Amino acid sequence: MNLARHSISSTTPVLIFDVQFDPDCHIFTASTQAGFAVYRAWPLQLLRKRELTGGTLAAVVPLHTSSLLFLLGGGRSPRYPPNKVILWDDALGQEVAELEFRERVRGLACRRGWLAVALRRRVVVFELGDAVTRYGEWDTCDNPRGLLAIATATHSTLLVIPGRQMGHVQLVHLPPCPAPEITGPPPSTAPVKPPPAPLKHPVSIIAAHTTALTTLSVPPSGHLLATTSSRGTLIRIWDSTTGKLVRELRRGTDKAEIYGVAFRPDEREICVWSDKGTVHVFALASGSGASNRQSTFSPLTPFIPLPKYFGSEWSYAQYRIPSQSAHISISTPPSKPATADVVDEEKCVVGWIQAPSDNQEDPGRGPLIEHQLIVLTYTGGWYRLSLPTSTSSATSSSVPISSPISAAVSASPPIVRAMSAARPRSTSGSSFAGHSDKGKEREQEKDGKDSRDCTLREFRRFGRWDGWG
């Protein structure tokens, strides 16, 4: 019996143009060619989706877990002009306002009642209420990435934007962030008190780097600030009140494009991710149960003049994101048309959540809650990672974790493929492997010494695997 020859090829990759966590990492949004969707971050669940016609979106930015979203048009056929910000009320399913500028919008940051818009050389801030009111405007250096970050905790005031000189950061203090509205029964805990007024006026400019900035990040409180530059090797942590350098952390030795930095909500750790396909975790607080790696020559630096490199702190944990080929490809993929949109298969966004630990020592005391990471890739991968040392972040609780999120619209769950251990990156047997895999292997050999891997607790898919996009 003769059978016709069949070829096995990978499925068409999901085209996700942008992924955004809300400030508290309770939900995230995903923009695709078909529209956008809102998901619960953990447990992963599709909450609602909007299939749009007439163009594509570059970004959908959520305002906490409210129904208000900020839309930016983009792609090869933008739904909205790139110089507009659309305020979309998803409860109404329609646009409620728009902001128009004379140039393309580069970035957005928001908190309750406020929206900051980054343009090429300035940042404009608006107050949101019954009407949208222009609050102020600040000049910056050339800012093609649209960098800005805003503190979102109750009573926080900090907005950070690029300075007028390359590598500098401006610290702007807005009116205090209001507390979230209470929709259910009153909480049992006392309301958060505003912090005491600083003894002296806080700094307004930090000379963070000598090269162009690539990321700006702040924790919810706004007490700290993280900066990275185009060199992509160092992460600097600053005190936002005094402007002093608190820590200097080293991602690696090879030049890389750092995509983002995220503070743990209690500011005891940070995570960093880049185009190397690796998520690095650093400890910030002493006595946190985890310590960053250091050179064996580090203890000698107070006594012997050694190069600064030998005093560097390296991540204590990391996780290498498997390439798309490790999931869905076992042969050469079909050729792509020249006009097809291309998504970086290893570009990702990372956020912190709190989840029950898999290591329960005393079942009678209730679930042990720990900080974990959620990694979202632009090809629709959802990873839940636990840290190698979780004792510092674990707390006992008898109350189940819940998020203030509306009920789901879609009843079809995503495909689940849970795993209990990290899976090594596959760099052979597929033409989907990244063009810089060799450099990543070198980084893994150098930076992987004495480091520990995060544990992959759960892997799932979002996007087209939910039946949309």
Residue ranges and their predicted role:
Residues 24-25, 65-66, 112-114, 154-156, ...:
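Conserved loop/turn motif of beta-propeller repeat scaffolds
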Residues 35, 56-57, 62, 139-144, ...:
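Terminal intrinsically disordered, low-complexity extensions flanking WD-repeat/beta-propeller proteins
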Residues 28, 69, 115, 159, ...:
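Hydrophobic beta-strand positions that form the internal "hydrophobic ladder"
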Residues 13-20, 55-61, 103-109, 141-152, ...:
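Canonical WD40 repeat/beta-propeller blade segments in eukaryotic WD-repeat proteins
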Residues 92-153:
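Asp-box/WD-like beta-propeller blade repeats and closely related beta-sheet repeat scaffolds
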Residues 24-53, 74-89:
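Beta-propeller domains
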Residues 40-47, 86-94, 125-138, 164-204, ...:
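Per-blade loop-tip surfaces of WD-repeat and WD-like beta-propellers in eukaryotic adaptors/scaffolds
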Residues 5-35, 54-67:
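Beta-strand-rich domains and repeat architectures in extracellular enzymes and scaffolds
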